[in-house]
Design a protein with these regions (language model features):
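Short, exposed beta-strand/loop patches in secreted or surface proteins that constitute
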Residues: 42-45, 88, 96-97, 132-133
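Generic structural detector for well-ordered beta-strands
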Residues: 53-55, 89, 134
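Generic structural signal for buried aliphatic residues
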Residues: 52, 67, 96, 140-141, ...
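Residue-level recognition of short, solvent-exposed, well-ordered loop/turn junctions
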Residues: 47, 62, 91, 99, ...
Length: 171
């Protein structure tokens, strides 16, 4: 009895098994490095993206790039641990300032402006959102490029341990 299949059906079945196995291994390798992220803030217009490919292997912060992170200060708007993606606007050593006229400056350069999500905050509480700070080691300032973005201008910097990976816009 030969172990080599002689019929066309048997050869076809072997090919299907090999292709299926290759697809499963490829899928597992892809999933171990990448995750698909859906922008939960699409209605707020935070960044021009609804779907992102997140590279979990690329966690080295680079200013100006989109990074996904686990939000830990976004309650009650979003649960702690919610995956978010924003532009990395400032890195350790950078100075971030939110001015009285609601301009957001990074090292003196305007990144964006506005704090529209504070419309219902009493005037006497607005001062806690205004100020200047120099980011410490492992602190990163995440900003959307739209005024209505819910980002670091409202809850401060994130820690390096919150970064999941670099985001690439799919659409």
């Amino acid at each position: 009895m030969s172990l080599i299949p002689s019929s066309g059906k048997a050869r076809w079945a072997i090919k299907v098994c090999v292709i299926t196995g290759c697809l499963m291994v490829s899928g597992a390798l892809f999933a171990s490095r990448f995750v698909i992220g859906v922008n939960p803030q699409s209605g707020l217009g935070c960044i021009d993206a609804n779907l992102l490919l997140i590279d979990k292997a690329d966690t080295t912060p680079k200013k100006g790039q989109i990074f996904a992170y686990r939000a830990m200060q976004a309650e009650p708007i979003y649960s702690n641990g919610t995956l978010m993606a924003k532009y990395l606007a400032a890195v350790p050593g950078d100075t971030v300032e939110v001015t009285r006229d609601y301009r957001i400056l990074v090292n003196g350069q305007e990144f964006t402006r506005g704090l529209p999500l504070l419309i219902d905050v009493p005037v006497d509480e607005l001062d806690r959102f205004i100020g200047r700070r120099t980011l410490q080691a492992d602190e990163y300032w995440m900003l959307g490029d739209k005024p209505r973005s819910f980002d670091s201008r409202y809850w401060g910097p994130i820690h390096a341990s919150q970064i999941v990976g670099r985001g690439y816009v799919i659409f």
